[in-house]
């Protein structure tokens, strides 16, 4: 299977630049062999079997979970490493205050200098060349990358998460543009040295070079650190491409909402982690006659079409979801998606060779093998699955995937939602006055870090646009880009922007809104607003539903609870507004003037 890289006849592309780059990386990393991935089913099976032989994969019960595998990572390699994630822009100012910057020349020396960590890093291993496309092949909204990796786990995962293999090389032609992504586990094998099931290195670097559109990742085999099409390309590098080319690369789900009568609407929504993004993307509405279908659960690439509307694609081909908390009662559609063809990492194993995690079932099994390989019972006092345990599954298996989820033209976005986890102050749903006010709402996305004292605003963790860990350039400039993309557009065709909060708590510390499927009631009001059919009331912070406009029929929600969810307390909001300048000042002169205008207008409206 290994091909001699030096013989052009054995290389499945005529792209000179790509061939020369692959040769260059092979020379640097010194793998035993080089394999160009073709993305075929046969290749997937072969690599999966190799991973089983190595002990990385364990095949799950073929009847309960066909063509599915279990993997347990090294206990030190379980999540994204934000403190080891670098933006290596030419100027430090371009990375901004919320990213870790490193001088690109210095970083290249660390990687490829005389003592560079990539030097010989693939010794004793196979180097896989993984051509992949973010978005449907052939779409004007899509973009190509090539990941070089010494991890077969990455190669098989990329087949699920992206369009991968020979069709991508065919699309690339002889001179097409591609983002260069280099990944090594940083675990070379000397001759005769035994391998471990999950190789990695205690030193880790996840580095992005925005100007040259490159990603270099060292030392981790896990998730977003290693599947470089996901956060590294689709958000950090793509956000820079979007800035330069006038589009948006966003940490957003995309869903299709169809009322009993009338046209379907497409909605994009950005929430920080642990705010129920995947649950909303796969929502089962409780409102009669309404349907939700999924376009994407994590990332949206959006461009303005010739008709002046904003069109979005889901650049991914799979779901890489957090397993714990996903269950029949929280996300039945995700559970149905996971029937087979899935890889589960760091979940627990049942005695009959299936998987389990916290929140998956009402009843906890009496005995499991936990993610570290230990015997586990409910008395163990530790989680059976790691809190960041993941599933990797083709999006096409989702029972409510929209037929147009791979439409190369994308889908027209009518509404954009922002939201965080706020126990206090923030109402259930707020419509922005206009686009710039909506950008102001997005810029102030926050979740509470600490429990708030009664009536007080708790300490906030700001996560503008839910992009804080994923923006590839200065966050102040990024906010400015949101203002700029709409400047010359027909305002009537822009998506309306909303801020939602499912997480308000009462004085007893209990959630007031039931959430989950009931969130469809809020979506219903939004669609009716878009159609000009629903009442709204102007408040100092935006437009809220009137009590009658929000459909609460059949909901166990008292009038006082509804008032609580739809009231703007001016005094609390003066406190809230007082926190904004410190946040906007973080970005200094990079903060767009328009956001300061919005802040001053808010203060004035609050009186």
From Swiss-Prot:
<dbReference type="GO" id="GO:0046327">
    <property type="term" value="P:glycerol biosynthetic process from pyruvate"/>
</dbReference>
<keyword id="KW-0456">Lyase</keyword>
<dbReference type="GO" id="GO:0006094">
    <property type="term" value="P:gluconeogenesis"/>
</dbReference>
<dbReference type="InterPro" id="IPR018091">
    <property type="entry name" value="PEP_carboxykin_GTP_CS"/>
</dbReference>
<comment type="function">
    <text>Catalyzes the conversion of oxaloacetate (OAA) to phosphoenolpyruvate (PEP), the rate-limiting step in the metabolic pathway that produces glucose from lactate and other precursors derived from the citric acid cycle.</text>
</comment>
<feature type="binding site">
    <location>
        <begin position="222"/>
        <end position="224"/>
    </location>
    <ligand>
        <name>substrate</name>
    </ligand>
</feature>
<feature type="binding site">
    <location>
        <position position="421"/>
    </location>
    <ligand>
        <name>GTP</name>
    </ligand>
</feature>
<dbReference type="GO" id="GO:0033993">
    <property type="term" value="P:response to lipid"/>
</dbReference>
<dbReference type="GO" id="GO:0004613">
    <property type="term" value="F:phosphoenolpyruvate carboxykinase (GTP) activity"/>
</dbReference>
<dbReference type="GO" id="GO:0030145">
    <property type="term" value="F:manganese ion binding"/>
</dbReference>
<dbReference type="GO" id="GO:0005829">
    <property type="term" value="C:cytosol"/>
</dbReference>
<feature type="binding site">
    <location>
        <position position="390"/>
    </location>
    <ligand>
        <name>GTP</name>
    </ligand>
</feature>
<keyword id="KW-0963">Cytoplasm</keyword>
<feature type="binding site">
    <location>
        <position position="80"/>
    </location>
    <ligand>
        <name>substrate</name>
    </ligand>
</feature>
<dbReference type="GO" id="GO:0006107">
    <property type="term" value="P:oxaloacetate metabolic process"/>
</dbReference>
<feature type="active site">
    <location>
        <position position="275"/>
    </location>
</feature>
<comment type="similarity">
    <text>Belongs to the phosphoenolpyruvate carboxykinase [GTP] family.</text>
</comment>
<dbReference type="GO" id="GO:0019543">
    <property type="term" value="P:propionate catabolic process"/>
</dbReference>
<protein>
    <recommendedName>
        <fullName>Phosphoenolpyruvate carboxykinase [GTP]</fullName>
        <ecNumber>4.1.1.32</ecNumber>
    </recommendedName>
</protein>
<comment type="subunit">
    <text>Monomer.</text>
</comment>
<dbReference type="InterPro" id="IPR008210">
    <property type="entry name" value="PEP_carboxykinase_N"/>
</dbReference>
<keyword id="KW-0210">Decarboxylase</keyword>
<feature type="binding site">
    <location>
        <begin position="516"/>
        <end position="519"/>
    </location>
    <ligand>
        <name>GTP</name>
    </ligand>
</feature>
<dbReference type="InterPro" id="IPR035078">
    <property type="entry name" value="PEP_carboxykinase_GTP_N"/>
</dbReference>
<feature type="binding site">
    <location>
        <begin position="388"/>
        <end position="390"/>
    </location>
    <ligand>
        <name>substrate</name>
    </ligand>
</feature>
<dbReference type="InterPro" id="IPR013035">
    <property type="entry name" value="PEP_carboxykinase_C"/>
</dbReference>
<dbReference type="InterPro" id="IPR035077">
    <property type="entry name" value="PEP_carboxykinase_GTP_C"/>
</dbReference>
<dbReference type="GO" id="GO:0071333">
    <property type="term" value="P:cellular response to glucose stimulus"/>
</dbReference>
<keyword id="KW-0342">GTP-binding</keyword>
<dbReference type="GO" id="GO:0005525">
    <property type="term" value="F:GTP binding"/>
</dbReference>
<feature type="binding site">
    <location>
        <position position="298"/>
    </location>
    <ligand>
        <name>Mn(2+)</name>
    </ligand>
</feature>
<dbReference type="Pfam" id="PF00821">
    <property type="entry name" value="PEPCK_GTP"/>
</dbReference>
<keyword id="KW-0312">Gluconeogenesis</keyword>
<keyword id="KW-0479">Metal-binding</keyword>
<dbReference type="GO" id="GO:0042594">
    <property type="term" value="P:response to starvation"/>
</dbReference>
<feature type="binding site">
    <location>
        <begin position="274"/>
        <end position="279"/>
    </location>
    <ligand>
        <name>GTP</name>
    </ligand>
</feature>
<comment type="pathway">
    <text>Carbohydrate biosynthesis; gluconeogenesis.</text>
</comment>
<dbReference type="InterPro" id="IPR008209">
    <property type="entry name" value="PEP_carboxykinase_GTP"/>
</dbReference>
<keyword id="KW-0464">Manganese</keyword>
<feature type="binding site">
    <location>
        <position position="273"/>
    </location>
    <ligand>
        <name>substrate</name>
    </ligand>
</feature>
<feature type="binding site">
    <location>
        <position position="231"/>
    </location>
    <ligand>
        <name>Mn(2+)</name>
    </ligand>
</feature>
<keyword id="KW-0547">Nucleotide-binding</keyword>
């Amino acid at each position: 299977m290994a091909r001699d890289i030096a013989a052009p006849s054995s290389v499945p592309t005529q792209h000179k630049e790509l061939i020369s780059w692959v040769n260059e990386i092979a020379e640097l990393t010194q793998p035993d062999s080089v394999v160009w991935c073709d993305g075929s089913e046969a290749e997937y099976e072969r690599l999966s079997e190799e991973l089983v032989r190595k002990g990385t994969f364990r095949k799950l019960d073929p009847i309960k979970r066909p063509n599915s595998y279990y993997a347990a990572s090294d206990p030190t390699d379980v999540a994204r490493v934000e403190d080891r994630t670098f933006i290596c822009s030419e100027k430090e100012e371009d990375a901004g205050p919320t990213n870790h910057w490193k001088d690109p020349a210095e970083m290249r020396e660390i990687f490829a200098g005389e003592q560079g960590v990539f030097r010989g890093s693939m010794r004793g291993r196979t180097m896989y060349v993984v051509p992949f496309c973010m978005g449907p092949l052939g779409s004007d909204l899509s973009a190509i990358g090539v990941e070089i990796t010494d991890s077969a786990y990455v190669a098989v995962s990329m087949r699920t998460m992206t369009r991968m293999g020979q069709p991508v090389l065919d699309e690339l032609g002889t001179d097409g543009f591609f983002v260069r992504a280099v990944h090594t586990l940083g675990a070379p094998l000397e001759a005769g040295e035994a391998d471990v099931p999950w190789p990695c290195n205690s030193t880790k670097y996840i580095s992005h070079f925005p100007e040259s559109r490159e990603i270099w990742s060292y030392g981790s085999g896990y998730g977003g650190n290693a599947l470089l099409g996901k956060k590294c390309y689709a958000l950090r590098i793509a956000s820079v491409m979007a800035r330069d080319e006038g589009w948006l690369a966003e940490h957003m789900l995309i869903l299709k909402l169809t009322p009993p009568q009338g046209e379907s609407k497409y909605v994009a929504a950005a929430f920080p982690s642990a705010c129920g993004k995947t649950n909303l993307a796969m929502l089962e509405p409780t409102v009669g006659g309404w349907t939700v279908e999924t376009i994407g659960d994590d990332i949206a690439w959006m461009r303005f079409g010739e008709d002046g509307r904003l069109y979005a694609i889901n650049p991914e081909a799979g779901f890489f979801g957090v397993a714990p908390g996903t269950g029949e009662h929280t996300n039945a559609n995700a559970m149905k998606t996971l029937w087979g063809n899935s890889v589960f990492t760091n979940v627990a194993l049942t005695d009959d060779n299936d998987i389990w995690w916290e929140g998956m079932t009402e009843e906890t099994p009496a005995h499991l093998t936990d993610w570290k390989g230990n015997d586990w019972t409910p008395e163990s006092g530790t989680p059976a699955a790691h809190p960041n345990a993941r599933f990797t599954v083709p999006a096409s298996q989702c029972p409510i995937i929209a037929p147009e989820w791979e439409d190369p033209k994308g889908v027209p976005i009518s509404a954009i939602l922002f939201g965080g986890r706020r126990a206090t102050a923030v109402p259930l749903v707020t419509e922005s006055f206009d686009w710039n006010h909506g950008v102001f709402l997005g810029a102030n996305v926050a979740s509470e870090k600490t429990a708030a004292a009664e009536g007080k605003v708790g300490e906030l963790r700001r996560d503008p646009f839910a992009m804080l860990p994923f923006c590839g350039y200065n966050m102040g400039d990024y906010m400015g880009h949101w203002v700029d993309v709409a400047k010359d557009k027909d305002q009537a065709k822009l998506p309306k922007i909303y801020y939602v909060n499912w997480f308000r708590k009462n004085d007893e510390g209990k959630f007031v809104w039931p959430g989950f499927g009931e969130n469809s009631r809020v979506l219903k009001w939004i669609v009716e607003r878009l159609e000009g059919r629903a009442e709204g009331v102007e408040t100092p912070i935006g437009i809220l539903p009137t009590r009658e406009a929000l459909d609460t029929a059949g909901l166990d929600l008292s009038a006082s609870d509804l008032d609580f969810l739809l009231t703007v307390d001016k005094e609390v909001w003066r406190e809230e507004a007082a926190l904004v300048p410190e946040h906007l000042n973080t970005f200094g002169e990079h903060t767009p003037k328009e956001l300061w205008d919005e802040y001053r207008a808010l203060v004035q409206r609050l009186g």
